[in-house]
From Swiss-Prot:
Record's function text: Acts with TAL1/SCL to regulate red blood cell development. Also acts with LDB1 to maintain erythroid precursors in an immature state.
Molecular function, one GO term: chromatin binding
GO cellular component: nucleus; protein-containing complex
Coiled-coil features, chain-numbered ranges: none
Broad class of where this protein is predominantly found: nucleus
Stated name of the protein: Rhombotin-2
Subcellular location as annotated: Nucleus
Keyword Repeat attached: yes
GO terms under biological process: embryonic hemopoiesis; negative regulation of erythrocyte differentiation; positive regulation of transcription by RNA polymerase II
InterPro entries: LMO_RBTN_TF, Znf_LIM
Keyword Nucleus: yes
Domain comment as written in the entry: The second LIM zinc-binding domain interacts with KDM5A.
Assembly notes: Interacts with BEX2 and KDM5A. Interacts via its LIM domains with ELF2 and LDB1. Also interacts with basic helix-loop-helix protein TAL1/SCL and can assemble in a complex with LMO2 and TAL1/SCL.
């Protein structure tokens, strides 16, 4: 289960934060170290308040309060995206090399086919594709626009 991490402030003049709290700092207890939170900025996640340094992945220890990070909470564990996918994600096979793709790896997807980034290249000239490049998917082979005619001719498709 993915959960948002909210950034909080006790100073109403500070922007941007998700919310300015009107709670005396002495009443806020960190969900990690159980100490009072006297910091100007702190986090709220899993219905608790946290020092920014105390909200971390239970497996790898990375800070979950950094901008752009998501918190995954399952079976009582706070997890980063990578560790969540490593534990609970589903692995698959690359349509090009037939080797395992780990759930946390970056991939390219074309229709129902999934590829390692390094395998997402033209089957004829081996050129890696860039954003905007045109290609054709023939079975599980990806062929660049320049090689389509030759590839289909060699492989008896036309």
């Amino acid at each position: 289960m993915s959960s948002a991490i909210e950034r909080k402030s006790l100073d109403p003049s500070e922007e941007p934060v998700d919310e300015v709290l009107q709670i005396p700092p002495s009443l806020l207890t960190c969900g990690g170290c159980q100490q009072n939170i006297g910091d100007r900025y702190f986090l709220k996640a899993i219905d608790q308040y946290w020092h920014e340094d105390c909200l971390s992945c239970d497996l790898c220890g990375c800070r979950l309060g950094e901008v752009g990070r998501r918190l995954y909470y399952k079976l009582g564990r706070k997890l980063c995206r990578r560790d969540y996918l490593r534990l609970f994600g589903q692995d698959g096979l690359c349509a090009s090399c037939d080797k395992r793709i780990r759930a946390y790896e970056m991939t390219m997807r074309v229709k129902d086919k999934v590829y390692h980034l390094e395998c997402f290249k033209c089957a004829a000239c081996q050129k890696h594709f860039c954003v905007g490049d045109r290609y054709l998917l023939i079975n599980s082979d990806i062929v660049c626009e320049q090689d389509i005619y030759e590839w289909t001719k060699i492989n008896g498709i036309i």
